[in-house]
């Protein structure tokens, strides 16, 4: 468990320093960051182990928002992939009520949220979950009055109890999101997506397909590989390439990438780099699209090496194939199972968004 937590915390620790040390070599910055890792890991792990038990580790990820409050005795978990919200506490029901209200009314701005502090998430006048969850009367949860009434209803009618392995009792409620919650989230970002699509000449549906696969449109998304935000941009790789293309030095900070406009622009900029620089020699548009999708996940070099170790020879071989052959090879021969599945998922998601446009 400690090893897993270490991996989960690495991105956050690295993020703490990269916004102020962008001129530092990545390896040097990484080494400096890890010096304080034992302290941060120990503190967070100790809180979770002591309060929830060693088998109850729950941390934020690409498609999961997780926030601890009340000195870590209360936590909220929004699964954007499964479309379900679970809010639970080991304290009194007033704390559960408070957590329900704050979760339902949290905003979309991830920049100011400290996932390792145990304070409440601020209530927003523009709740991010608006339109994705309805109360017991079927109305949208747009303000504190509606959220408070719904929280009271949930506690009075839907309260559940479970016992942890450490003997602690947990009281919790589970709130399903509406059936088309993914599409509702996607619509929130359409203006930004369209702007970036037009600016860089990238298909709108491709951006949507990648964003759904990467984060399920979760603005708080972060991965163990330090991929940040909606399009899961890795600061020291894709982020650095994007900054170089824009004539900037260094790499984007975590705070920069948690801004949806910046994140989408960076992600689509990287698609432009893949399309017009790293994979420019591929002539068939469909074959190039398949290669771009796979490269967004595993890197252009890894994609080309599937066909040949020499870049020019790899591109030549791709150009001799039908797109269906390129797709089959990338989804069956690529050495990374994640990359193989990634192309399948993005292609499926992109087709779905094409139909709905």
From Swiss-Prot:
InterPro entries: Lysozyme-like_dom_sf (IPR023346), Murein_transglycosylaseC (IPR023664), Murein_transglycosylaseC_N (IPR024570), Transglyc_AS (IPR000189), Transglycosylase_SLT_dom_1 (IPR008258)
BP GO annotations: cell wall macromolecule catabolic process; cell wall organization; peptidoglycan metabolic process
Gene Ontology cellular component list: cell outer membrane
Key words, A-Z: Cell outer membrane, Cell wall biogenesis/degradation, Lipoprotein, Lyase, Membrane, Palmitate, Signal
Places the protein is found: Cell outer membrane
Pfam families for this protein: Mltc_N, SLT
Membrane topology, record value: Lipid-anchor
Lipidation (S-diacylglycerol cysteine): 16
Keyword ATP-binding in annotation: no
EC class of the enzyme, as a word: lyase
GO terms of molecular function: hydrolase activity, acting on glycosyl bonds; peptidoglycan lytic transglycosylase activity
Signal peptide annotation: 1-15
Lipid attachment residues per UniProt (N-palmitoyl cysteine): 16
Catalytic activity: Exolytic cleavage of the (1->4)-beta-glycosidic linkage between N-acetylmuramic acid (MurNAc) and N-acetylglucosamine (GlcNAc) residues in peptidoglycan, from either the reducing or the non-reducing ends of the peptidoglycan chains, with concomitant formation of a 1,6-anhydrobond in the MurNAc residue
Task of the protein: Murein-degrading enzyme. May play a role in recycling of muropeptides during cell elongation and/or cell division.
Family: Belongs to the transglycosylase Slt family.
Protein name: Membrane-bound lytic murein transglycosylase C
Species of provenance: Haemophilus influenzae (strain PittGG)
Organism phylogeny: Bacteria, Pseudomonadati, Pseudomonadota, Gammaproteobacteria, Pasteurellales
């Amino acid at each position: 468990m400690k090893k897993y937590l270490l991996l989960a915390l690495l991105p956050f620790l690295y993020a703490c320093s990269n916004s102020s040390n962008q001129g530092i070599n990545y390896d040097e910055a990484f080494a400096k960051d890890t010096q304080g890792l034992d302290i941060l890991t120990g503190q967070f792990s100790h809180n979770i182990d002591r309060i929830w038990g060693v088998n109850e580790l729950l941390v934020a990820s690409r498609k999961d928002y997780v926030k601890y409050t009340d000195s870590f005795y209360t936590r909220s978990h929004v699964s954007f992939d499964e479309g379900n919200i679970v809010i639970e506490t080991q304290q009194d029901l007033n704390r559960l009520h408070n957590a329900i209200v704050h979760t339902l009314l949290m905003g979309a701005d991830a920049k100011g949220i400290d996932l390792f502090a145990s304070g409440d998430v601020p209530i927003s006048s523009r709740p991010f979950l608006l339109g994705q969850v309805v109360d017991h009367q079927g109305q949208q949860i747009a303000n504190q009055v509606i959220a408070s009434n719904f929280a009271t209803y949930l506690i009075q009618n839907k309260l559940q109890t479970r016992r942890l392995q450490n003997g602690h009792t947990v009281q919790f409620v589970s709130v399903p999101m509406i059936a088309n919650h993914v599409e509702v989230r996607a619509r929130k970002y359409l203006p930004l997506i369209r702007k970036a699509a037009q600016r860089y000449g990238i298909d709108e549906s491709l951006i949507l397909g990648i964003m759904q696969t990467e984060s399920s449109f979760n603005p708080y998304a972060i991965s163990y590989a330090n991929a940040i935000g909606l399009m899961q941009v890795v600061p020291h790789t894709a982020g650095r390439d994007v900054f170089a293309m824009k004539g900037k030095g260094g790499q984007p900070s975590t705070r920069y990438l948690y801004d949806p406009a910046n994140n989408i622009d960076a992600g689509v900029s990287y698609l432009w780099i893949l399309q017009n620089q790293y994979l420019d020699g591929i002539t068939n548009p469909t074959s190039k699209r398949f290669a771009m999708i796979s490269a967004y996940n595993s890197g252009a070099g890894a994609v080309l090496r599937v066909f040949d170790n020499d870049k020019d020879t790899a591109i030549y071989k791709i150009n001799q194939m039908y797109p269906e052959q390129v797709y089959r090879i990338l989804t069956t021969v690529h050495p990374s199972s994640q990359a193989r599945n990634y192309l399948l998922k993005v292609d499926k998601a992109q087709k779905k968004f094409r139909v709905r446009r």
